[in-house]
Each structure stands twice: as C-alpha cells, then as structure tokens.
C-alpha cells in the first residue's frame, strides 16, 4: 500500500467531483428543467454548450469514482472518507469567488468550511498503522 498514491487518487476524486458540481450548477442555470430537454431540443432552443458541460460533468463523476476506488486500495476508509469533505469546501470557495456563479460568501458558511477543513486535517494528521489485523490476508 502506498499512502501517497492513495492520497493522490483521493484528491483527484475530490477535484473531479468538485469540477462536476460546478459544471452542473453552471449548466442548470442555462438549461430548462431536465423533463423539458427533449421538447427544447426538438424546438432547437437548448444551449448545446451547457448540455455538453452536463455530459462532461457526468464523465467527471465516473472518473471520480474510478479515482475513489483506487484510493481505497491504499488508504483506510476512515481516513479516505474524510478527504471527500474537501469537496464541500472547494465547491463553496470556488462558487463564491467566481463571478459566473453569483454565490455570496457568508460568515456562517465560511466558518463551517473552516471547521470541515480542520476536521480533515485532524483526522489525517495522525499516522495510521501500516497494517491492521483486518487488513492482512
């Protein structure tokens, strides 16, 4: 098991799922409700770029899942799972700082994100045992 490789795959999963969330948000502000996509496509009134971003976001979710599965080969679940919380912070910070999302910074959300990051650091700062009786064949 390689802890560094596990962290790299877990953080890759976080980056992909965060990008997918932002892409979905951007797209859904430019598209009709999903049940109206087919009628809108027939009428030629769908933003094809937004639809392409939805497709790319779905692909990013699939790649994120692959990275997650690879991360789980190298990291204990309790440690790896905490890393997923970084996506909440990342999505909030990017959505609030990029003007195209028009999301506000708020004190309560920012404090919540700080607590999440502090929790991730706390969980991952202790060194984990290399193996445990449950992990050995």
Swiss-Prot record:
One of its GO terms (biological process) is lipid A biosynthetic process. The lineage of its organism: Bacteria, Pseudomonadati, Pseudomonadota, Gammaproteobacteria, Pseudomonadales. Translocates 4-amino-4-deoxy-L-arabinose-phosphoundecaprenol (alpha-L-Ara4N-phosphoundecaprenol) from the cytoplasmic to the periplasmic side of the inner membrane. GO terms for molecular function: carbohydrate derivative transmembrane transporter activity. The chain crosses the membrane at residues 6-26, 50-70, 81-101, 103-123. GO terms for cellular component: plasma membrane. Heterodimer of ArnE and ArnF. Residues 1-5, 71-80, 124-137 are cytoplasmic. It is a multi-pass membrane protein. This is Probable 4-amino-4-deoxy-L-arabinose-phosphoundecaprenol flippase subunit ArnF. HAMAP family: Flippase_ArnF (MF_00538). It comes from Pseudomonas fluorescens (strain ATCC BAA-477 / NRRL B-23932 / Pf-5). It is found in: Cell inner membrane. The gene is arnF. It comes from the Bacteria.
